[in-house]
Each structure stands twice: as structure tokens, then as C-alpha cells.
Amino acid sequence: MIMGYNLKFLIITIIAISLTDVLAARTYSRRVVLGDERFEEYQPLLQGKRVAVFSNQTGIVGDKVTGSKLADALAEYGGCFPRKRVDEISLIPFTEPSVPGGKIEYGQHIVDALIEKGVDVKAIFSPEHGFRGNADAGEHVSSSVDEKTGVEILSLYEKGSRIPSKEKTDKFDVLVIDIQDVGLRYYTYYITMHHLMEACARDGKQVVILDRPNPNGFYVDGPVLDMKFKSGVGWLPIATVHGMTLGELALMINGEKWLENGTCDLTVVPCLNYTHNTRYSLILPPSPNIKDMRAVYLYSSTCYFEGTVVSLGRGTQFPFETYGHPAMTGYSFSFVPRSIPGAKSPQFLDEECHGVDLRRKPLRDIWAEKINLEYVIDAYRNLNMGDKFFGKNNFFELLAGVDWFRSMIGNGSSAAGISARWASDVENFKSRRAPYLLYPEI
């Protein structure tokens, strides 16, 4: 099935099979089929066209992989978490081979696959962390050439604006998007997608999204962004955990008219055998500091520490799965951030931090809690440093997306009390996003 969004007439058209067929397909296979595997559906859109690709290291067609301990553990379950082994499997690092010293082999990258099939790939756009995914968070990645294919990699971090210039869009007719997101407002890949859609709307280019599952797509939580806090870690008026795939979010961007240049000519190639209740496992890090599936699930709660004086474990092998500070007391656990690839200058470099290890918390508890503010509140009360806890800028507000988080924490509110304040935001956002969902919420 391809769901097409005709931007000139602002209607959604079913190009291939209906959503009913997607539901029926689930009875024949438990394996989720990614949009990029369905070449026969999107090949006509690329034939005879100059193509650019927005992707990174996650753009592996069908998420095919061999030699991976994680992939082996998930193989019999179609890439989804089994009930009995959920906690064990979530702790397996993406990069751990099946056997000690073994090598993990990934399937074809979408760029290689398109070129092999005769598609005229003219350019690659890469997000934060670069095309190969090894740059630090926020690090500016310059234009270059992909060594394997010779295709030009166009930077989105040059000349001030992250919206591609007409000079860059003149290089292609169709933009293909195939990248793994994790479904959070402050996870920046959707922002890059928005900027690319903006440029394509401006210059009359087609956009084809090869959809992928959202590993956090089974719930919606957190406040909707107050647009006075619009920034590079929050660009659209969406909930913190929006529960949408990139394809669905792109449809919403068009439908809600969130592009300054109107709407773009958008087609989404959906996944098969996927629902919003699927616990889909990734096969490799979507960004350098998300090293296993537990980090994917904890990210919505622990990322708030980026806007505080507390470390969330950058510079360790378990970022987003811990938190600590040299001055925190009463904890038996400690860690020491080091300079490592993807975290060259972590907070509290080479200092011992005392705090909490979340790596053994049952995954079902993490799922049930959704966004858990207990971690931030615990650290705030332990350090007892008042507003200095939030650092010298407003980055905490940019992550929170609202101006009342900080004051409620400072006034002694409970995590439940704070989350109750955003409950209406969640319900309103769920209603607003409903027309754009491609997958059942079961």
C-alpha cells in the first residue's frame, strides 16, 4: 500500500491497496515489512528522475543484519520483543556480535540499493551526526563525497540556514527519505525532514518517504510545544512523545499547513504488518549515544538532564540509562564519563559521578510509566541547589517545551502532579493527529 498525499488538492489518495489489506497481511507474517523493501511500489516514482536521498547509517533496507546478537535473539519473533525475554533482549548492545570477535554484517543501504537498481542518485542529505552517524550531537557536518558510491553528500549546516538552498534542490527531482527516528520531539531527525519538505515545497520537488516503525509509537505523552520555545530541539506543536512514524508526521505537517511554502508533493510508502502497539526493535544505533533498546525507551525521561547540571551518562557505554553528579550523595552506584567516539567532551569528563543505574529496571515498568519525571525530581532534591540545577540558560525549557516544568519542580510538585497538567495536551494532540495515522492503534 502506498498512501499518497496530493499537495495541490490536499487530499489523501490510496494508490495501491487499502488499510484493510495491511491488517489482513498481519495474519500471514509477523515480520514488519519496511517501506524501503517495497521497491515495486515506489520505483515508478523514481524512474527517469534525478534522486536525492535523506538518510544515515540506519537506512538499511528491511533492517537486514547477520552476526548480531540482538538480531539473532529477535529473529524468531520477527524483529519484535517476545514476552518472556523482553528485559534480557533490551540490554543487548546494538553493536554486540553473535560470537566474541565476530563481525556484524548489515544488509544493503538504501543508497546502494537504489543505485544497484538503476536509480539516478545525485545527492545525499544527512542529519545531525552525519551520514555515517559518528558525529557528536549538534556537531556541524560539512559537505563531502560518499567514498563508497561517489555520491555528493550535501550539508544542512552551512551558510546559516538548515533549509537547503535552491542551488541544492536544483540537483534533484525527487527526494527519498529513509531514516530511523525514535519518535520524540527533541530527537531532531524530524526537524531535518521538515526543513527538506520546506525546500521541496518552495521549489516544486517531490518527496517520497519510505516509512519505518516508531519504536516509541505505542503511546503519546508530554506537553505540546509552546511555540515560543521553538528551537533546534523542538520545531512543531506536537507532544513530547508523538507516537507517529515519520510518514505519518509528514502527512500531518502537510495537512496542518506547517510549511511556510505551502505544501509539498508527498507520497508515503507504509510498512506492512505494523501497528501502533508493535514493540519493534532497531538493529543499530539511530545516533551515537543510543546504544541499546533500553536507551530508546528511557530517552523520553532522561533526556531532560541535558538541560540540567546532571550527567545522563554521555561518555559511558550506557548513556540515557543512568544519571548522576559528583556532588550527589546517598547512592551506591557511580560512573566516570570518558572521551569516546560520539561523546568527545562529555559533562564531568574523568570525574566520578554518583547516582542511579536504570539498566535493570523492568522494561514493562518503563513502558507503563511513559515519561517519568521522578528521575529529574530525585536529582533536583538530592543536590538541593535550587534554580542552579537547571544551568545558566533555558535549555531545560527548550526540551520541556513549556515554561511551567521548572517552577513546578522547584515548588515541590510530584511527578504525577506535573504529568496531570499535560493530560489535556495529550488528548487534544491525539485527536488532532488522528486523520494522519496510517497504522491501527491496536
Give residue spans per PLM region:
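N-terminal phosphate-binding or glycine-rich loops at protein starts, especially the Walker A/P-loop
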Residues: R31-F81, D87-V119
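Glycine-rich, aromatic-lined ligand/substrate-binding cores of catalytic
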Residues: L272-E351
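Glycine-rich oxoanion-binding loops at beta->alpha junctions
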Residues: A137, S142-K171, L184
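Short internal beta-strands
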Residues: D120-E128, L210
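Conserved functional hotspot residues or short segments at active or partner-binding sites
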Residues: P319, Y323-A423, E441
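Glycine/threonine-rich flexible loop motifs
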Residues: D181-M193
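Conserved anion/nucleotide-ligand pocket segment
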Residues: F229-T302
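Glycine-rich, charge-decorated loop segments at or immediately adjacent to ligand/cofactor-binding or catalytic sites
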Residues: R132-A137, V208-K230
